[in-house]
Amino acid sequence: ALALRGMSLFDLTKLYGYPYTYDNGASLGASIVTDVVEKDYLPQRSTVAQCYDQIINDLEASVSLLGEDFNKGKINKWAALTLLSRVYLYHGDNEKALNAAKAAIEGAECHQYQLWTNAEYPTAWSNDVSEASTNKGEVLFEIINLTTDSPGKESLGYLYSPHGYYDGCVTKSFYNFLKKDNDDVRLKIINVATKAQGYSSS
């Protein structure tokens, strides 16, 4: 729970606050809520610095509590360390970021996580993510989301679908950059939608 709370607050702080290094976290970030509150509770926004203090405390505590084994759809020690490394980087603690990343890589390698090959990369994004799956590849943590889960407009898949909100698209400039090398494996996971696909005519 600590790792997921830290991850959630990290995402909210990035979304609603300036980067920490902009003003050493002095500006407003997200609201920190660590207790169960009443439905009419109106939390005040904390500073970015306060948010990062909470995020780091949560993630550092979680690293010592989480298990090391792979568990599909569940966060483990290596995923928490990876996330902590990213938080340290955003916080400007480069040495801590490097040390956490090294610890995550070494631990993951000991537990048979392996980087995808170029041949595996295009299909890895559509691998089975059900709880029964034992496939992990280089995935440290992922959300279990099946085609049968909440197929309506509030589902995760609808956010990225060309027929939905289309929030997961790459920019044209980035796509053109990738096309400079026709062997770039990332081109194989991009679905180029036409305007007709992307917009409803109704």
Describe the role of every protein-language-model region.
Residues 1-69:
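Aromatic-anchored glycine-rich loop motif in surface-exposed flexible loops
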Residues 8-19, 90, 107-116:
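Secretory-pathway/luminal and periplasmic proteins that interact with or process carbohydrate-rich
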Residues 10, 89-98, 102:
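Secondary-structure transition into beta-strands, especially the periplasmic turns and strand N-termini
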Residues 61-65, 83-90:
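Well-ordered alpha-helical scaffold segments within catalytic/enzyme domains
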Residues 98-202:
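Hydrophobic-face positions in mid-chain alpha helices that act as interaction patches
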